[in-house]
Amino acid sequence: MSPKSAFTYRDYEALPNDRRRYEIHDGELCVTPAPSIEHQIILSNLVRALMRHIPSVAPGLLLFAPLDVILSDRPDETTIVQPDCLYIAPDRMALTSRRGIEGGPTLAIEILSPSTRTIDRVTKRGLYARYGVPYLWLIDPDTRAIEAFRLEGDRYVVAATAARADPVDLPPFTGLALVPDALWPTPPRDR
């Protein structure tokens, strides 16, 4: 995409507030629908579990979408993402600003959905690696599993996987004892 047609942060700020999720990947606008109720329940359960752990063992800042993570604000390669959840360790607190997070958080967490599966697994994973996000979790409601990745050089390697009811530590946290089965929603009522 040429710089003239690339989306910039200024273009991004002018987008409507219409319940869609807008991101810019290397100057290209990416639009996805609002998350499903299942997605939101998983996110809520995850945030609750992490909030029990973070203040006492891993000081830092836990935030969740919608929140702009501005990986690059250059006119020719603007990249703005909205991970479902993110963690900022104390050594990265300077990244916080009125606009959002300006740089790579310590941990980005994406909950896969039918409309974002390829974007999260391929596009955003590549962007997070390029911009130096040390850790990435991909949560898959279909397989009821969590993959935790650690950045080595310019690529992610699997650091841990989690499924079922076994408590597990996932990097960058120690002593977390996250129980994956506690994240999944109970089946919704039919109406």
Map each language-model feature to its residues.
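Gly/Pro/Ser/Thr-rich low-complexity, intrinsically disordered segments predominantly at protein N-termini
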Residues: 1-191
